[in-house]
Amino acid sequence: ESVDIVHGDTNKVQFGMGTYGSRSLAVGGEALMKALNKITDKAGKIAAHCLEASEADIEFKDGQFSVAGTDKSMAFGDVALTAYVPHNFPHETLEPGLEENAFYDPANFTFPGGCHICEVEVDPDTGTVSVENFIAVDDVGRVINPMIVEGQVHGGVAQGIGQALLEGCVYDDSGQLTTGSFMDYTMPRADNVPDMDVGNTVTLCAHNSLGVKGCGEVGTIGSPPAVINAIVDSLWDLGVRDIAMPATPQKIWQAIAVAQTSQAAE
């Protein structure tokens, strides 16, 4: 609660490449940690000067700089004030101010993993599908904000259900896109998406100090094959072995008809 984050102001921060590809915390967070380490290192030197102690004896914990083995301490806010109102300040060895920048270019990628399980009901007479239950367990490394991670999974699964069952770019014989607006492009609604059970395991990423992995795409990657596999499994005894996305009622009905015709011919 003592930190205010300035969003999207290029007058305040350096230009960045963006947070695409689930990079927000795995890349931006690491740059933030590097900058914070620079800040605390400099603040520790200022605290050592103010507390008349050696830099090696300064400890930082819970927003307080303290001298090891003593009751002498100084709050971070007081150190920051001293940095910008530098009375009795060692100007010859330390610049006033408490502002740092950091750049982080990851040497490797992060690899989240998980398991998604979907339960569906399929009406073989009409080809309609109802998604009844969905369970998603993912490993995104250390979870910094559980609410954000769960929200990413919920949103991703909803998108994945749409991709698996409803969404597609359709062109007519003249090449005209016929699904170019929300009037024609089918997307999942609340009644198409079930309540979800979301969980996580934690395997720390070895490529960054936070141990985090990207979570922005785990829902959209795991859910489409889970939905399609559930549909195919439900129709396995009818001879259906594969259905291309989106698995619309028409495609499912046709797949059942083709499979039954093949079985009858055998």
Spans of model-derived segments:
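Cofactor-binding beta-sheet edge motifs in enzyme active sites
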Residues: 1-266
